[in-house]
Amino acid sequence: MEPSKMAPLKNAPRDALVMAQILKDMGITDYEPRVINQMLEFAFRYVTTILDDAKIYSSHAKKPTVDADDVRLAIQCRADQSFTSPPPRDFLLDIARQKNQTPLPLIKPYAGPRLPPDRYCLTAPNYRLKSLVKKGPNQGRLVPRLSVGAVSSRPTTPTVAPPQAVSVPNKVATPVSVTSQRFAVQIPTSQSTPAKPAPAATSVQNVLINPSMIGSKNILITTNMVSSQSTATDSNPLKRKHDDDDDDDDDDDDNDTM
């Protein structure tokens, strides 16, 4: 910088001239004029803080005035808080001596870089990756499935007839839910009631009525038809005896004519 900037003005305050002389004694000759103002501000703040701490220590010790011991104690406490200095050389030597007494770990016996075990290496990873399993949109919940074309073959389960279009001229049919009902109706083949009914095989006939003919309900009627074989065996026994008597009379008449 120019010499005019480094040289303090003659009409400057006495504190500024003292600070410039301190910088010159330390060998600092290249600086800006505002450096003097910054150094003066720092010195004023530092001295004020030290004197305030010394006054507190003096009042704590119940002294009438602040003496040099209070100022010295304040400087020592402020230096420990504001400034850091390296530890003493003797302290560092003691720590180094204790550390060097610990033997080094063994080297791994394989080819490659001769490094100590992983727990002693600073380059060893100290974390473990965990794989994230992403669930799909359909995983973890039940998906309903429709089975088309599966028809039950049980005889007792009624089947619903496929819907048929019925044209009505005056009234339009509304879609309704079709429900099936099953009624068992027994229809006898003859009016005569046998005296002793015998068990016989019956044939079951299923009659399916179109729901459009009767309404919104599908009625399944099961009729029990009695076979002809069972009716022949269940005839009146008195009638069979009368027929046998007639046959005997005819045989007697034939014998008389001969």
Curated annotation (Swiss-Prot):
Belongs to the TAF9 family. One of its GO terms (cellular component) is transcription factor TFIID complex. The modification Phosphothreonine is found at T159, T174. The gene is Taf9b. Induction: By apoptotic signals in PC12 cells. Binds TAF5 and TAF6. Component of TFIID and the TATA-binding protein-free TAF complex (TFTC). TFIID is composed of TATA binding protein (TBP) and a number of TBP-associated factors (TAFs). Binds N-terminal domain of p53/TP53 which is essential for transcription. This is Transcription initiation factor TFIID subunit 9B. The modification N-acetylmethionine is found at M1. The keyword Transcription regulation applies. PANTHER family: TAF9 RNA POLYMERASE II, TATA BOX-BINDING PROTEIN (TBP)-ASSOCIATED FACTOR, TRANSCRIPTION INITIATION FACTOR TFIID SUBUNIT 9B. The keyword Nucleus applies. Residues 227-236 have a biased composition (Polar residues). One of its GO terms (molecular function) is protein heterodimerization activity. It is found in: Nucleus. It comes from Rattus norvegicus. GO terms for biological process: DNA-templated transcription initiation; negative regulation of apoptotic process; negative regulation of transcription by RNA polymerase II; positive regulation of cell growth; programmed cell death; protein stabilization; response to thiabendazole; transcription by RNA polymerase II. InterPro entries: Histone-fold (IPR009072), TFIID-31 (IPR003162), TFIID_subunit_9 (IPR051431). The modification Phosphoserine is found at S147, S177. Residues 244-258 have a biased composition (Acidic residues). Essential for cell viability. TAF9 and TAF9L are involved in transcriptional activation as well as repression of distinct but overlapping sets of genes. May have a role in gene regulation associated with apoptosis. TAFs are components of the transcription factor IID (TFIID) complex, the TBP-free TAFII complex (TFTC), the PCAF histone acetylase complex and the STAGA transcription coactivator-HAT complex. TFIID or TFTC are essential for the regulation of RNA polymerase II-mediated transcription. Keywords: Acetylation, Nucleus, Phosphoprotein, Transcription, Transcription regulation. Residues 227-258 are annotated as: Disordered. It holds the Pfam family TFIID-31kDa.
